[in-house]
Amino acid sequence: MSNDVKLKVYLETSFVSYLTGGVTLNAKIAADQAYTRIWWERERSEVEVFISGYTLAECEEGNATRAAERLGAIKDVPLLPDRSDEVVLLARKLIDGHALPEGETTDALHIAAAAVNGMDVLLTWNCKHMANPHTLPKTRQIIASSGFFCPAIMTPKTFIENTEMEVSHV
């Protein structure tokens, strides 16, 4: 997948949590963690990876040991510039336009941060509010009508599968 121009990929907090998550008996979560780690090892060097202050703040929360693991994993990932006025305004539009529910401000802020900063892809395991095929059309419409490009919002699994399809068709 080596091109002259690298994709700009935004990492939402669930990505970081799955990357550093401990052993689980939940088979689905274990599989998702495995996809996340595969993406991190195989795809990260092929793209430009970014986080926002929202990702950083959420990674600092919770159990101190787990927080340290999350922060350690992203310590070298560039932080997007603070464009908070634009991000907050777009996030509000996403909620007011019913692309995301009223109580999901942080999810809206992640999407808005990625859009305002010109990301190509937003990686997340949040399929309820973010990587949801039922809400994505509304999200795209609101972002486009606000003058921004909507990043492809997907799971690491989808990213890997799409990359494998791209390579197999070459």
Indicate residue ranges for each PLM-predicted region:
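Short, well-structured N-terminal submotif of metal-dependent ribonuclease cores
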Residues: 1-51, 60-71, 96-102, 136-139, ...
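C-terminal interaction segment
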Residues: 146-170
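C-terminal end-helix/capping segment
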Residues: 131-152
